[in-house]
Regions:
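Divalent metal-coordination and catalytic microenvironments
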Residues: 38, 58, 76, 87, ...
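Active-site beta-loop-alpha junctions enriched in small/polar residues
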Residues: 89-93, 117-119, 147-152, 182-185, ...
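Histidine/acidic residue-rich metal-binding segments in metalloenzymes
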Residues: 127, 161-180, 187-252, 259-279, ...
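Active-site mouth loops of central-metabolism enzymes
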Residues: 85-96, 151-162, 230
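Structural motif
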Residues: 32-33, 70, 110-112, 140-143, ...
């Protein structure tokens, strides 16, 4: 009986809200908020419209002439729907979700779709639950796609191994939209049952499946899409994008920190295919967030490159909302959320105000909001993810020659640069190692690297995609051990070391990949650490830490390093 009463009470509350919305829309009651004299982007008719915008119960209820308890005159300004990032790993910001929200709200972002595969590789399902709790009721609505590839490959030693059973219960969460980027497209195309069952499980819950298949074409692409993968964010040229568009995929145009594809894909925004395109960042690092912004930066850049402003705005909100079936946002129309971005004009694109569900969150000053409460067990778990014995110089010397990973300037791919049996900084030959840190296996993969430029000391980080073990490069074994030990002592982060002394560091104590500090503090420490790394000789043309973090991802040709040693991606063997 109590269940029926509870249900009846819920219906009654919703009925009262709905009746209030109808009364306000019909002009029989004042709105909670009215944006007076608005010029707004209509994403349905692709035009600028004029009139008041009335909001009640957090929803837009009408356009025309309205009166409200609060009225804001927006004459001479443009009102846009709140922006949506269609694909991002929040962990790439290096800060907590609360700090991320503080960073992007002033830039008009009101919804993001995140894939928490970074923290899931460290903490497994506890990592997913941590992020769900850490994003509850934030003024940026954080929606989730569940990680599809943990670990990224069987070659990785990650903190977890997630099959479809591990993540299945999360599909019932109201903020879970589907299955995140299916990176193992080879497994899909080859009909690997353990891979495809993740897609089948997501479809059984009537959820979306995102793609990740750079350059896939022909029958392989047919097979990938036939399996149920209907988007891709890895297109870097028009040929790849058109191949996928013609077969029904949506294209997420990526403009982030590590990869920037907007310019190459601009023809999509001036074509009949624009409704199949949306914007995403994928990865967004602290300096980018502070210096450039977020989705607003992509919109501004697209307009500067020749996109129709209304088309650019649609790609920043409406198209993503439609793809993810978020039918209550991405437009300014009755029944949609009162998520607004108010700018001066399309030319300057200065954001003056941001509203979330009809509440002013930014008007030159960001409004305060509380951080969500997280289960103490999960907080403790997230701050205790390093299980590594104390390291010594001897751990980095086995007396054998190892393959040399040859860096290529300006590229993320590498080449085979032969073998070496000792570090020779003058010849730009440095030792590189990956230390397993999740299960105290004492597995340490050794190799050498050419092109990094370090002349003295060592650089270490616990951001090493995708398993986030400790990766360290150095001129001496002693400094490599000291740098790696410092990472463990700090429970994660980035360290620049010389002669046993810390020159610069960033503490990332949340799972070893995010900080408890503010974005400004993290960025300041990061820039200082970069300067110290450059001072030790690291080549100025590279990012000392981002470059290092991708050296451990054994899916990018040609040579990579894991906890088992140097791996040849092309031949799929250790060398």
């Amino acid at each position: 009986m109590s269940v029926k009463e509870s249900y009846a009470g819920k219906i009654n509350r919703k009925l009262n809200k709905k009746l209030h919305v109808i009364d306000v829309a019909a002009g029989r009651a004042p709105a909670d908020l009215v944006l007076k004299n608005a010029t707004y982007v209509n994403v349905f008719s692709n035009e600028l419209c004029h009139g008041d915008i009335a909001v009640a119960e957090g929803l837009i209820v009408g356009m025309g002439e309205y009166h409200g308890k609060m009225e804001v005159d927006v004459s001479g300004k443009l009102v846009l729907p709140g922006f949506i990032d269609a694909h991002i790993h929040l962990e790439s910001s290096l800060v907590s979700p609360t700090e991320f929200a503080k960073a992007v709200l002033p830039h008009g972002t009101t919804t993001v779709i995140t894939d928490p595969h970074e923290i899931a590789n460290v903490m497994g399902t506890d990592g997913i639950e941590y992020m769900l709790q850490a994003t509850e009721d934030l003024p940026v609505d954080v929606r989730f796609m569940l990680p599809s590839c943990v670990p990224a490959t069987p070659l990785d030693e990650s903190g977890a191994n997630l099959d479809y059973r591990s993540i299945d219960s999360f599909y019932d969460h109201p903020r879970v939209q589907g299955l995140a980027e299916m990176m193992n497209y080879v497994g899909v195309v080859n009909g690997d049952g353990q891979v495809v069952e993740k897609i089948v499980a997501s479809q059984a819950h009537h959820k979306k499946i995102d793609g990740h298949a750079p350059g896939l074409s022909g029958k392989d692409l047919n097979a990938y899409i036939a399996a149920g993968v209907y988007s891709d964010h890895e297109c870097s040229d028009m040929e790849d994008a058109m191949n996928k568009l013609r077969l029904g995929q949506y294209i997420m145009i990526r403009e982030g920190t590590a990869a920037r594809n907007l310019e190459a894909l601009m023809p999509l925004l001036t074509s009949q295919y624009v409704d199949r395109c949306m914007f995403c960042t994928d990865d967004k690092h602290p300096n980018d967030l502070l210096e450039k912004g977020h989705i607003d930066y992509i919109v501004k850049k697209a307009i500067s490159l020749g996109a129709d402003p209304i088309v650019a705005v649609k790609a920043a909100c409406h198209n993503a909302a439609r793809y993810f079936l978020l039918n209550n946002r991405g437009a300014i129309a009755p029944g949609y959320l009162g998520d607004f971005v108010i700018i001066d004009d399309f030319q300057h694109f200065e954001i003056e105000m941001v509203y979330k569900r009809g509440v002013l969150m930014y008007d030159g000053q960001l409004r305060d909001f509380p951080a969500p409460e997280i289960d103490p067990y999960l907080v403790k778990r997230a701050h205790d993810t390093f299980h590594v014995a104390h390291l010594t110089a001897e751990d980095f010397s086995d007396g054998r020659p190892h393959a040399v990973i040859g860096m290529i300037p300006g590229e993320i791919v590498t080449q085979d640069a032969g073998y070496a049996d000792h570090a020779d900084p003058e010849q730009d030959i440095l030792k590189i190692a990956v230390i397993e840190r999740h299960k105290n296996t004492h597995h340490i993969g050794l190799g050498y690297i050419k092109g990094y430029g370090l002349k003295r000391g060592a650089v270490a980080t616990s951001i090493s995609h995708d398993s986030h073990n400790i990766i360290v490069v150095g001129a001496t074994d002693e400094d490599m051990a000291a740098a790696a030990n410092r990472i463990v002592e700090n429970r994660g982060g980035i360290t620049v070391m010389e002669n046993g002394q810390v020159l610069g560091e960033v503490t990332l104590s949340i799972a070893g990949i995010m900080s408890d500090d503010s974005l400004v503090m993290v960025n300041s420490a990061l820039e200082d650490a970069k300067d110290e790394a450059f001072g030790l000789g690291v080549s100025r043309g590279i990012d000392p830490f981002m470059t290092l973090s991708f050296m451990a991802l054994p899916v990018i040709p040609s040579l990579r390093i894991t906890t088992r040693g140097v791996f040849d991606v092309s031949s799929q063997r250790y060398i």
